[in-house]
């Protein structure tokens, strides 16, 4: 209420004892009056006590932190469950093939799965840039950019998937030969029968990967991704025994069951994304097919190809470097002996099962950081990433402790040979250290992906892989043990973690560094 409006003639509820002759409007004073200099301008209203204000601000900060923690966990836990289902699915084909087709067919799955995992792990890297690009577009309220990104990504995946299917079918014997399956080996035919149908599922798998990345990135709906994974697992569980036992399809039947499940999940994912409000998010299937295979251009499809291809090339290089390091480690341990190799295989499976519990925090940090940076909130992105890292480190510590406490039970459940059990227990300390390193490294890499720094992540991983391979090759000359090789792998992880943390939080080029975040807040 202004001083003029406080007059009793205008406001009867006011006290009549006030000296209203002083209630003079500023506009009625002469121009040169000092009151025009701002003496009657309202100043800031200060609270009588700063205690409640401080408490209220602390309470608000705690509320914001709890809200962001819930957001991180809501993204992380469905992703963790979805990633944990994959190892179980990989055992499904193994179970039915071993039960119904015999040891030769079971042994043939080994090299076929090696080739399949190698190729698909590299191809699936397209999901990382798609997740960041769609998250940034939605945060910036540019749905047309989401449509453009998905058009480009789906065209790329369909083209690459078709090439992989055709070339893989022709070159399957050569690919299996790289896994030590010779032309005269009895493993060749069942391995080829399994590999070729799986490669024909490449277009469907890549489509599913891109749409899942869109659901988790643009819409932050990892629960929908989990439902898709469960759908694929259910279909695979039903179709695999039907194809192997009912139709006597052999290893090819098991592969076709997985491929059909993948295509069905891709169709459901397409429907989920297309029905999201605020679209259109997806191009029409006919136009997309014409663009991918007939060369007809869709509006917006020709723009921004360089960014997507560069990001995918960088992620491919990163995955190739990491997989090559593990391949070299496996080859060196193979020369050490059978028991260390069996222990290495069991520890790798166990380690990956524990590692998937931290994958969700990498995804959450990537999605939330990319959205906050797109909104111009680098300081919020910084403490979001730090809180995600704290959660990941807690999970990493818990999994490392669980591995140490349950090492004997895990070894006894996997193998019965006392030599293998003894070798397995010697690998527990380096595996625990690797879990702790991953707790920080994966979140740091998720931040870098959210910032779009794919090229630097690829360079860092390539450098670290070269260093780790060099250490392992030097150790191979002095009769190393399997724990020596695993500690050498920790060289790779440590380099990636240290340089990744510096790049994400301390580099001058990072918007999440403390100085850059403060400068951005002051500018705003």
Residue ranges and their predicted role:
Residues 81, 85, 89, 119-123, ...:
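Residue-level hotspots within pore-lining transmembrane alpha-helices
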Residues 1-45:
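N-terminal chloroplast transit peptides
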Residues 71-84, 93, 129, 300-332, ...:
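Core transmembrane alpha-helical segments of multi-pass membrane transporters/permeases
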Residues 106-166, 208-220, 224-225, 341-407, ...:
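Small-residue-rich hydrophobic transmembrane alpha-helices
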Residues 91, 210-214, 237-242, 270, ...:
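Alpha-helical transmembrane segments of multipass membrane proteins
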Residues 80, 84-107, 176-185, 242-249, ...:
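Helix-terminus/linker motif at the lipid-water interface of multi-pass membrane proteins
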Residues 124-128, 197-217, 228-233, 254-270, ...:
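Short runs within selected transmembrane alpha-helices of multi-pass transporters and secretion channels
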Residues 28, 39-76, 134-204, 238, ...:
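Short alpha-helical transmembrane segments in multi-pass integral membrane proteins
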């Amino acid at each position: 209420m202004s001083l003029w409006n406080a007059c009793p003639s205008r406001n009867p509820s006011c006290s009549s004892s006030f000296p209203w002759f002083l209630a003079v409007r500023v506009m009625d004073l002469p121009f040169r009056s000092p009151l025009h200099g701002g003496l009657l301008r309202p100043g800031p209203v200060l609270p009588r006590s700063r205690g409640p204000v401080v408490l209220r601000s602390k309470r608000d900060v705690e509320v914001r932190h709890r809200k962001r923690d819930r957001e991180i966990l809501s993204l992380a836990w469905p992703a963790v469950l979805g990633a944990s289902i994959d190892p179980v699915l990989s055992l499904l084909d193994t179970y039915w093939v071993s039960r119904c087709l015999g040891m030769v067919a079971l042994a043939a799955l080994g090299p076929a799965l090696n080739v399949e995992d190698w190729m698909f792990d590299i191809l699936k890297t397209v999901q990382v840039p798609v997740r960041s690009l769609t998250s940034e577009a939605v945060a910036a309220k540019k749905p047309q950019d989401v449509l453009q990104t998905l058009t480009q990504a789906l065209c790329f995946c369909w083209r690459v998937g078709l090439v992989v299917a055709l070339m893989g079918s022709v070159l399957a014997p050569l690919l299996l030969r790289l896994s030590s399956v010779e032309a005269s080996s009895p493993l060749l035919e069942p391995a080829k029968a399994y590999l070729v149908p799986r490669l024909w599922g490449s277009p469907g798998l890549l489509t599913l990967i891109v749409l899942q990345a869109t659901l988790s990135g643009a819409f932050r709906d990892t629960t929908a991704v989990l439902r898709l994974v469960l759908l694929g697992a259910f279909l695979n569980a039903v179709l695999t025994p039907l194809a192997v036992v009912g139709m006597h399809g052999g290893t090819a039947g098991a592969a076709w069951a997985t491929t059909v499940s993948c295509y069905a999940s891709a169709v459901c994912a397409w429907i989920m994304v297309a029905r999201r409000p605020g679209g259109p998010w997806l191009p029409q299937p006919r136009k997309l097919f014409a663009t991918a295979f007939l060369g007809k251009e869709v509006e917006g499809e020709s723009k921004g190809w360089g960014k997507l291809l560069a990001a995918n090339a960088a992620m491919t290089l990163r995955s190739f470097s990491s997989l090559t390091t593990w391949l070299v480690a496996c080859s060196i341990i193979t020369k050490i002996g059978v028991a260390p190799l069996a222990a290495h295989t069991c520890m790798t499976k166990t380690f990956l099962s524990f590692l998937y519990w931290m994958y969700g925090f990498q995804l959450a940090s990537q999605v939330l950081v990319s959205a906050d940076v797109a909104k111009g909130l680098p300081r919020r992105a910084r403490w979001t990433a730090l809180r995600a890292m704290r959660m990941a480190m807690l999970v990493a510590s818990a999994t490392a402790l669980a591995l140490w406490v349950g090492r004997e039970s895990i070894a006894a459940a996997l193998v019965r040979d006392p030599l293998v059990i003894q070798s397995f227990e010697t690998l527990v300390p380096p595996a625990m250290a690797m879990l702790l390193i991953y707790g920080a490294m994966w979140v740091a890499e998720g931040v870098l992906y959210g910032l779009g720094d794919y090229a630097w992540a690829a360079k860092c991983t390539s450098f670290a892989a070269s260093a780790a391979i060099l250490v392992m090759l030097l150790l191979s000359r002095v009769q190393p043990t399997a724990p020596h090789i695993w500690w050498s792998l920790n060289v790779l992880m440590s380099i990636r973690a240290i340089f990744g943390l510096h790049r994400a939080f301390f580099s001058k080029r990072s918007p999440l560094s403390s100085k850059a975040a403060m400068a951005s807040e002051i500018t705003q």
